[in-house]
Structure formats: C-alpha cells, structure tokens
Swiss-Prot record:
Subcellular location: Cytoplasm, Cytoskeleton, Microtubule organizing center, Centrosome
Entry similarity comment: Belongs to the tubulin family.
Domain of life of the native organism: Eukaryota
Record's keyword annotation contains GTP-binding: yes
First-listed, main subcellular location of the protein, grouped into a coarse class: cytoplasm
Protein's UniProt name: Tubulin gamma chain
SUPFAM superfamilies hit by this protein: Tubulin C-terminal domain-like, Tubulin nucleotide-binding domain-like
Sample GO molecular function, one term: GTP binding
InterPro entries: Gamma_tubulin, Tub_FtsZ_C, Tubulin, Tubulin/FtsZ-like_C, Tubulin/FtsZ_2-layer-sand-dom, Tubulin/FtsZ_GTPase_sf, Tubulin_C, Tubulin_CS
Lineage: Eukaryota, Sar, Alveolata, Ciliophora, Intramacronucleata
Native source species: Euplotes aediculatus
C-alpha cells in the first residue's frame, strides 16, 4: 500500500520550487497540466498516489498546500497552464497581501494568527489519505515567509502529527541576499534542528556555481536554478514513486541516512545535469562513471562542504540501464581508491538504490544518479551564518525590526535559545568526526539534546 506524503509550499521560493517539482512529477507520471492521465500512461506500474490523489472526475490532484503572505507567485501559478492542477481549497494567500517584509518575526506571528485555517487544509489532506507517512516542506530560510511562517508550521505539524515524518527542502541564501538574513536563518535552523526529521540543504551559492560552471549559463535565472532543484527533488523521491526492493518509503530513506537524531542535514549531488534534454552533453554514463562523479566536489550542491570532514552516510539513487553485477565491482573500485572518507565509528559504505526511470521521458543518457549524503562538513554553512549572526548581535544591528513583532516585544530569549541550538549543532557535527563521538555531551548537563536519543522514525510501525 502506498504511504502518502503531503507537500507544504511556503513563501515565494517554496512555491516556485514546488511548482517546478509538480511539473517534473507530472511529466514522469504521464499526467498533463490539467491533471489528466495521458492514454500512453494508463497501464503504468508507478505509484502516483504517493503524491497525488484522484478527484471525482478522476483527474490527478497534488497532495499539496500552497501558502504565501503576498500574492505574486501563487497568482502566477494560478495563471499558468497548470492552474487547474491544484485544489483551490488548499491555497492560502494573506488578505493583507503585504508579505513578511523579510522579517522572520512577522512571518512567525502571521502564521500563529491563521494557524486554524492552515491546519484545517492539512487535516483535510491527511483525512483523505489511507496511510499517511509524512510531510514535505519546501521553503527558503533567508526571507520572512519561508523562514518565519515555515518555522511555525514545522512546530505545529510536529505537535499535531507527532509520529509522522517531516522532511524539508530548505534553500540556504546567497551572501547578502537579505540584509537581516543571519537572524532569519539562525531562527529557522533551530526549528529545522528540533522539528524536522530530515533536511535537504539546497545552497543557493552552490546551485548558482553549478549553473555557471557546468551548464555554462552566464547569468542563471531563478527559473533555471529552480529547475535544478526540482530535478533533485524528483530524483530523491524516485524510489517512493517507482518502488523496488529497498528504500521504497520515507522511513527507509531517512533511516539509512540519519544515524543520530540531530545530525539530519543532507547534501546532494546529481549527474549528468542539464536543463534541456535536447542539449545534454554527449558522454558515456556507466554506473562507475556516475558513482565517481557524484563524489566530485563540483557536483555537490553545498559550497565547500566536502573539502574537510567525513561522510556519515551516503545513499546513491541510480536510475537507468544498470547491470546489477557492476554494482559490487564499482563500489570495490571506489573503496580501493579511497574516494570517500567516512567517520571512524560507523560503517564505511555507500548504499545504492537502483531505481526505475520514467518511461515517458527521454533523458538522453543511459544512467543518471543522485547522491544523498550526510557529511560532517555541512557544518561549514551553519558556521558562516552563525558567525554573521554573532557579528550582527554584538552591535544589535537591525534588532528594532524584530522588536516590533509579538514574539520579540518583551525579550530576545528566542535569539538566545536559537544561538545555543545552532552552536550545539555545529559542535555535534565536529564531534561526529571522532571515534569517541558516542560519549559526546555526557558531561554537559546543559545539553539540549542527546546524540544517542532514538530517532522518531525508529518508533513508527
């Protein structure tokens, strides 16, 4: 039985990448922009109902809730060729339409005011599921809506559905994208640490570099960057939608990648990559070639993260024409050449999931691969944002903007709490590189979490 997943798209960025994700899923499942299954896809062996349900007229509708505090992006979606794909009852645009002004506090406060309306949408989707497995959140952590509203929504979903999994696709900012983004990011990372089970980190700097260096796009647009993100999102859900023997549900995916509860931030790599399949560069894509390329720094979608540190886990989702006998040989070659450095206290192995390709898309290459990896070097992106926050906080820079919102009008305790959680997260990823990690934090009575605490998903039946 398929285990359904509800997607929540929050803010400008969250809805933009969500839109591209649904376009990609429609193509891969043979669903047209109106939600009608094409004749050639009627007898498919895929699991469309993980992410879609069928309306009374049998057209497919995404299990999605679209949320924004300003109307521009959702209006564009509603005017696009995919306008009739979504359930209009699951779209929320704030009546004031003014956005959150890049202020986490405003986004968080606005979410609190309308929580009943949003939770009603989510409950309705959950009630329409036979076996709900979890939630996916798409958002950015730099601005106001994706960060603040997204943070509040994470907390409420976690409270409301304590045994359901929560995975996020979180876009981390380009430098100086928003002047107060160090504050917004710190406050968001606290919620991602305490309320999500798995966070796929999408680094805008790395995505832009990949578009420029690998795809030869001099000035990549938001649409082109979002297309890269949608490719990663679709590939990461392939085993759920085209199930095989392993990793065919959310629990299986996350359990294989998250060895300890708080270290659940993943980086990705994808190869071969192109925005237009007609112009895919001609190359030989063997299983070994794809596996090696996925470990190359230039293909990692978090800037500089793998230059130092060690892998805690790797799952490669390989699609295409693969001879299963080549899997062991290729893994042995990678091990012999020491292409991946693993932590000393865990299994030093790359997990491989062989997944089916959509029969409805001609990709232009025989084999493609997605790497989902838990690497201690991910702390570098947290450290940059944390240091920026500390610099701002020492000067109380722009703090008056936040003091005007309800959550900060009496005190700044929320900043202090977030500071501690993020610092502990950075410290834990550093500690995970050492053999004595299992004893880390035992002597610190003030620790907010225990690295040996069982993950939520270990208790799900």
């Amino acid at each position: 039985m398929p285990r359904e997943i509800i997607t929540c798209q929050v803010g400008q960025c969250g809805n933009q990448i969500g839109m591209e994700f649904w376009k990609q899923l429609c193509m891969e499942h043979g669903i047209n922009p109106e939600g009608i299954l094409e004749d050639f896809a009627v007898n498919g062996e895929d699991r469309k109902d993980v992410f879609f349900y069928q309306a009374d007229d049998e057209h497919y509708v995404p299990r999605a809730v679209l949320i924004d505090l300003e109307p521009r992006v959702i209006n564009c979606i509603q005017k696009s060729t995919y306008s009739s794909l979504y359930n209009p009852e699951n779209i929320y645009i704030a009546k004031h339409g003014g956005g959150a002004g890049n202020n986490w506090g405003r986004g968080y406060t606005d979410a609190e005011k309308v929580q009943d309306e949003i939770l009603e949408m989510i409950d309705r989707e959950a009630d329409g599921s036979d076996s709900l497995e979890g939630f996916v959140l798409t958002h950015s952590i730099a601005g106001g809506t994706g960060s603040g509203f997204g943070s509040y929504l994470l907390e409420r979903i976690n409270d409301h559905y304590p045994k359901k999994l929560i995975q996020t696709y979180s876009v981390f900012p380009i430098e100086n994208d928003v002047v107060v983004q160090p504050y917004n990011c710190l406050l968001s990372i606290k919620r991602l640490t305490l309320n999500a089970d798995c966070v796929v980190v999408l680094d805008n700097n790395a995505l832009t570099s990949i578009a420029v260096d690998r795809l030869k796009i001099l000035q990549p647009t938001f649409s082109q960057i979002n297309s890269i993100v949608s490719t990663v999102m679709a590939a990461s859900t392939t085993t759920l939608r085209y199930p095989g023997y392993m990793n065919n549900d959310m629990v299986g995916l996350i359990a294989s990648l998250v060895p300890t509860p708080r270290c659940h931030f993943l980086m990705t790599g994808y190869t071969p990559l192109s925005l237009d399949q007609k112009y895919t560069s001609v190359r030989k894509t063997t299983f070994l070639d794809v596996m090696r390329r996925l470990l190359q720094t230039k293909n990692i979608m978090v800037t500089g993260a793998v230059k130092k540190g060690a892998y805690m886990s790797i799952l490669n989702v390989i699609q295409g024409d693969v001879d299963p006998t080549q899997v062991h040989k290729s893994l042995q070659r990678i091990k012999e050449r020491k292409l991946a450095n693993f932590i000393p206290w865990g299994p030093a192995s790359i997990q491989v999931a062989l997944a089916k390709k959509s029969p409805y898309i001609d990709s232009g290459h025989k084999v493609s691969g997605l790497m989902l990896a838990n690497h201690t070097g991910i702390r570098s992106i947290f450290k940059v944002l944390y240091d920026q926050y500390r610099t701002f906080r020492k000067r109380d820079a722009y703090m008056n903007i936040f003091k005007q919102t309800k959550i900060f009008e009496d005190n700044l305790d929320e900043f202090d709490s977030s500071d501690e959680v993020v610092k502990n997260l950075i410290d834990e990823y550093a500690a995970a590189e050492k053999m004595d990690y299992i004893n880390w934090g035992n002597d610190d009575d003030d620790m907010q979490f225990d690295p040996r605490e069982p993950p939520k998903f270990s208790n799900i039946q």
